[in-house]
Structure formats: structure tokens, C-alpha cells
């Protein structure tokens, strides 16, 4: 059975723009290679917004060298980027953006959500790219709720959505650059779930709502449990109804050099990213 190496969380929220009050639950700045290929996870909300005249969100900003994965639980957001791609995602939908060689993008509450108001709840996960893929062309994947496999758990314990990777016979729709899994799980109170994950892969369990026993440890709302890579068996038991994410992936074992919105493999590549951005060499819409 997997052992918990550490439990991490953050009670303090900070604003990303004027639309996303987030708690950063983990980051490569503190966990480094231990969390690879994942870089960070921000949990936004749940937060209530009244109807508004002006749009809320975060304006155009750059990224290079990694991917952002946005999972919406409540509310609705719109995304536009410098490749001309974009879209609107609502409850259950996922936006998987590969910044790679460089992209400029903006994220706002949708016009519909802005005008009606409501509760916003979402996760944004950063996933590192192998150094060989960091300068690939950007890519945007819209994964609608209807296209994400839903699997009923044994003993009517709940439901697992396969966003990326494989669970049993079910393959998630996300195209990834390295072997990894992102599973969105609802586990009912008092129920148990056992998962077998690849030996040697990083494993983290993110609790968004509820309280969960992970092995011998209790993990609470807005906390992340980092587990060992040696034992493939992950044992979970819900103390009450729990919403959680299971993140698993093959470690990249490459240098992680980050500076704000850029994550590369060397300081020289960071300097080049800054120079390219400042000189308008990121992809721009025609």
C-alpha cells in the first residue's frame, strides 16, 4: 500500500486578475522533482459572484514550456489565445492548453456567467513538458464533459471520470506528451476505493471537498497528499462525500527552471523566453 510522504495545502487565497480567488495547493517551487511531471495546482473557489456589468478575469499574459489544464466544477469561463483558438467551458468540461513554444492567452468569466452571477469553482493544473517538446507548436484541446468517460466504481462507491490516462478499459480523451493520468473522482461517504498505479510513477491525491483517509493519513478539504512511487496500490476511504483528483505520471527527471509564466530546462532558455516575449516573437493571431 502506498505511504503518504507529505500533506500540503494553503489556507490563504490570492486573486488572479479580478475573477479567480485561488489557493495554490502545491508548487514545483517547494516540491520540485517530487511532484514531476506536475508543476502546480491552483484551486479557485468555491466563490460567489453577483451579476456584473464589466467582465471579470485575467487579461492577456504569456506562457512557455508547459501545459495548463483547467477543470470547471461550477460556473463558466471563456478562453482566447494568440493562435486564434479559444472556447467556453462549463461544469464538467476541461480545457487542456499546451503553451509549448509560447502563447499569449486570456481567461474571463463567460458573458452568460457574468450577467447572471453564481458560484465559481475550478482547478488549474500545470503539467511540465519534456525538454524535447518545450518548443513544439502550441495546441489547444477542449474536452467536453460528454466526451470524458465516466466509470461507476465498485460497490456503488461513486464515479471516476477519466480525463487523461487509462482506467481499466477506459481511455481519457486528453493527448499528453508523457505517460500520465488525471482522474476526477466522486467517492461516497463510508466507501472504499483501491487503485493500482504504475510502479515508479509520481502519485498525488487532491481533496477538493470532504475528508479522505489516504492509507493511514487523513487528508482534508483543499489539501494534497503526495505518495511514494514504490508501491502500486493506492487505498482511499471517504469519511464523508468527497470530490478528489488522482494525479499520476512518469517523472521527467529533467531540470525545472521557472520564472513566472515560463518553465524551461535551463536559465538560458528562460532568458530566451523573456527576450522572445519582449520582442513580440510569441505566436500571435493573424
Curated annotation (Swiss-Prot):
Cofactor(s) needed for function: a divalent metal cation
Enzyme class: oxidoreductase
Stored Gene3D superfamilies: Jelly Rolls
Cysteine-cysteine disulfides: none
Textual note on the cofactor: Binds 1 divalent metal cation.
UniProt-annotated binding residues for a divalent metal cation: 61, 63, 105, 107
Alphabetized InterPro entries for the sequence: Pirin, Pirin_C_dom, Pirin_N_dom, QDO-related, RmlC-like_jellyroll, RmlC_Cupin_sf
SUPFAM superfamilies noted in UniProt: RmlC-like cupins
Molecular-function annotations in GO: metal ion binding; quercetin 2,3-dioxygenase activity
Organism whose genome encodes this protein: Pseudomonas aeruginosa (strain ATCC 15692 / DSM 22644 / CIP 104116 / JCM 14847 / LMG 12228 / 1C / PRS 101 / PAO1)
Keyword terms of this UniProt record: Dioxygenase, Metal-binding, Oxidoreductase
Biological role stated in the UniProt entry: Putative quercetin 2,3-dioxygenase.
EC number, as in UniProt: 1.13.11.24
Catalytic activity: quercetin + O2 = 2-(3,4-dihydroxybenzoyloxy)-4,6-dihydroxybenzoate + CO
Descriptive protein name: Putative quercetin 2,3-dioxygenase PA2418
Statement: the UniProt record of this protein carries the keyword Transmembrane: no
